[in-house]
Amino acid sequence: MMVFLDTDVLVDCLRGTSSAQAWLANAASETFQVPGIVAMELLMGCRDQAELRHVQKFLNTFSIVWPEAAEFAQAYDLLATHRLTSGLSIPDCLIAAISLSHSARLYTFNLKHFRVVAGLDVQEPYARS
């Protein structure tokens, strides 16, 4: 099964959060992948060149999955369906569409938004302290 990581999980890992690091170490047999939009969100959070290099080095440890045209179309449909009722954002719609397209599990703490997407396998990866 393909497994994607959302931005919030990767931010915890980058910050060295003990629960995130322990979970990542225990799940070493899993092959985690990162949707391209998540990688871009991480770069947007960088404040200087040192952070940018650190994030890029971290991202190089994962396979990044870029959306196909059909996934953009599905993201559009998700946005049209859920934007006014759940607040699902454009990045969240792309992440959901890519996850659905690959029948992947998505680990995130943003369950409120993603749970409205039918058929999406979404779970919290670990308990936050």
Describe each model-derived feature in a short phrase:
Residues D6-T7, V38, N110:
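A secondary-structure boundary/capping signal
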Residues L10-V11, A39-L42, F114:
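A generic structural signal for short hydrophobic patches within well-formed alpha-helices
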